[in-house]
Amino acid sequence: MKIVISPAKKMQTDGGFLPKSQPVFLDQAEELWSYLHSLDQAGLEKVWRANAKITEEARQMLAADLTQPQVPALFAYSGLQYQYLAADVLDQAGLDYLDQHLRVLSGLYGSLRPFDGIVPYRLEMKSPLPAFKYKSLYEFWGEKVYQELYQDDSVVLNLASKEYSHLLTPFLKEGDRLLEVVFQEEKNGKWRTQATHAKMARGRLVRWLAEGGRDLSDLPGFTDFGYAFAPDQSGEDRVVFRKKA
């Protein structure tokens, strides 16, 4: 089983751990890095969908050398999901579990193992790519990420957003399973996903799996934040957790 999660916009360079490996798709990342270097201010503003001030600040990231990474991927992202995953306080068994099972989907790096060394960057899957030979990052990556994830596993637990899981969905073949995890809350008689709470729950679920060395059969036992497994809403490719608001 593999577990996929989205990256986070917020990143840091001091995670307290050293990288153990290079990203599988480092060559492709360097191609994208070179493309970003080739753009002028206006081009970067389009790619990053940012104003001049934010673009100038983000542009400083491009001075980094991808072959001299600063921090492992698992500790480079500091968004809400990663805060609740809290990998920095997992024991070695938990970290080993994540190293084996967890992958971070990335616009720049494609797919990252937890201890792949990376640098801070700004590049989302839906970023426009002016003056590039590919129309989109989806076209650039094609089947590469799918093939890497499914070469040894037929089951992937999907905790990523649709923006990132679309790196996989168009290429699924018979026998492949992409098991989506959904967190819902009841409000005004309707069940909806509350984005902030879902990010927290995704991070906590990854941690819960790692702490117990758990697999798919254990998923119904997750009850953090008051969520409970909803068997009537779940199915072959969907696991739903619900709670009363």
UniProtKB/Swiss-Prot annotation:
GO biological process: response to hydroperoxide
Transmembrane stretches, start-end: none
Cellular component, GO, one term: cytosol
Pfam family, one: H2O2_YaaD
Residues forming coiled coils: none
InterPro entries: YaaA (IPR005583)
Family as reported in the entry's similarity comment: Belongs to the UPF0246 family.
Protein name: UPF0246 protein Ldb2075
Native species: Lactobacillus delbrueckii subsp. bulgaricus (strain ATCC 11842 / DSM 20081 / BCRC 10696 / JCM 1002 / NBRC 13953 / NCIMB 11778 / NCTC 12712 / WDCM 00102 / Lb 14)
